[in-house]
Design a protein with these regions (language model features):
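Short, glycine-/small- and polar/acidic-enriched structural segments
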Residues: 55-210, 235, 251-252
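A bilobed periplasmic-binding-protein/Venus flytrap-type ligand-binding module shared by bacterial periplasmic
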Residues: 92-94, 158-168, 267-286, 333
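C-terminal motif of bacterial Sec signal peptides marking the signal peptidase cleavage site
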Residues: 44-47
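Short, Lys/Arg-enriched N-terminal segments with co-localized hydrophobic residues
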Residues: 1-25
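Conserved C-terminal helix/tail region of periplasmic/extracytoplasmic solute-binding proteins
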Residues: 345-371
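Secondary-structure end/capping motifs
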Residues: 280-354
Length: 371
């Protein structure tokens, strides 16, 4: 309107003069023109103003989209296992950890004997471990409950091999030398129990020759020549011997012999999963995640033997060809809860009755079991 008044004043304002009809018409035309011009000018200014105003919601959303999502921190957990079936069951989990796709950040230690990590397990430097069932009971008793059992991961894996044909029953072992491993652990106590149940004195009727590792026993059989050699070996060492020496046979399946004596509701429990008690109290979700991933790994191993065998070789546990033969006979599993407790208690009771030292002097109490 200021612009309109200036134009009118400049063109038509003359003091003391009258306005003609023509001039009045001209003024009306100019007035309309100026009004239209002003309207266009105001609309343009408004549009410019809108272009410079940002929607605060849009800006905030944009800021959120550009912000980095914080990385999820995985818990570092050290896991130990023995070089054998107890490690074979977790090879897919080991591969997932290597590829950084596991739920936790796992570090694995594969050992020849449980002695290599038992002290660290009690201290908590090793959080989880797979080891012989009776060794777990012994550690629990001697450490005043500093470890607990989570589940059974391996059932019977022992076989008595014979390069000849003289052994058909346990009683036929009388007067023989038996090569084996695991002095003071499951193999020794299982063998002694079978011998005693057959009426043989393990200390006088047979000679039990212990070697530090199963590979040494396999070497004795490989170098036997024409001499008959008898040995008790776990898988996959038994499979190795059978592959290298076609004339060697499985004379006795230790699990079958055990069940003949105790019924099918009692079986050999070779390996178990245990956890440091303090770690379990403070990290239950991490332990649950481990068990879920371990179960998945066991299912993979049992249903994809070729792929699992290759992973066994990749992690320097055994050659793939040996693992392929052994896995179907390894009884790899994961049994938890009440079923786990029932099987472990029955197995340990047999060992404890035969020799209390086999389980650390006494049966472990109910606190041993995570249910």
């Amino acid at each position: 309107m200021v612009l309109y008044n200036l134009i009118l004043h400049k063109k038509y304002a003359k003091v003391g003069t009258k306005t003609s009809k023509g001039e009045q018409k001209m003024r009306k035309g100019v007035k309309v023109t100026v009004l239209l011009f002003s309207a266009v000018l105001l609309l343009g200014l408004a549009a410019c103003g809108k272009k410079n105003v940002q929607n605060p919601q849009t800006t905030a959303a944009g800021s959120e989209n550009t912000a980095e999502t914080p990385a999820v921190l995985k818990q570092q957990i050290k896991v130990a296992a023995l070089k054998g079936p107890t490690a074979i069951g977790m090879v897919q989990l080991m591969e997932n950890a290597k590829e950084q796709t596991a739920k936790n950040d796992y570090e694995f230690q594969i050992a020849a004997t449980a002695d290599e990590f038992s002290a660290d397990l009690i201290k908590g430097n090793v959080a989880l471990a797979a080891l012989p069932c009776n060794a777990a009971a012994t550690l629990y008793n001697k450490s005043n409950g500093k470890i607990r059992i989570l589940g059974i991961n391996t059932l019977g894996v022992l076989s008595i091999l014979d390069t000849g044909d003289s052994v058909q029953t346990v009683a036929d072992l009388k007067g023989k030398t038996i090569y084996t491993t695991g002095k003071g652990t499951t193999p020794e106590y299982t063998l002694r129990y079978l011998l005693s149940s057959a009426g043989l004195n393990p200390d006088s009727d047979v000679t039990i020759e212990f070697k530090s590792e199963a590979a040494e026993v396999a070497a004795v059989m490989a170098n036997a020549g024409t001499e008959e050699v008898i040995a008790m070996l776990p898988q996959p060492y038994a499979a190795t011997v059978l592959m290298q020496q076609p004339d060697t046979r499985i004379a006795l399946d230790v699990t079958e012999e055990w069940e003949k004596l105790n019924g099918s509701d009692s079986t050999v429990v070779t390996g178990v999963l245990v956890v440091n008690t303090e770690f379990y109290k403070n990290n239950r979700q991490a332990v649950d995640d481990f068990l879920a991933e371990y179960k998945s790994s066991v299912q993979y191993v049992n249903s994809n033997v070729d792929g699992a065998a290759q992973l066994v070789e990749d992690f320097d546990i055994f050659k793939a060809a040996v693992a392929k033969k052994a896995i179907p006979k390894c009884n790899i599993t994961l049994i938890t809860g009440q079923e786990m407790q029932d099987k472990v208690e029955k197995y340990l009771k047999v060992l404890c009755d035969a020799n209390p030292n086999a389980v650390g002097g006494q049966m472990p109490d109910d606190g041993f079991y995570v249910k």
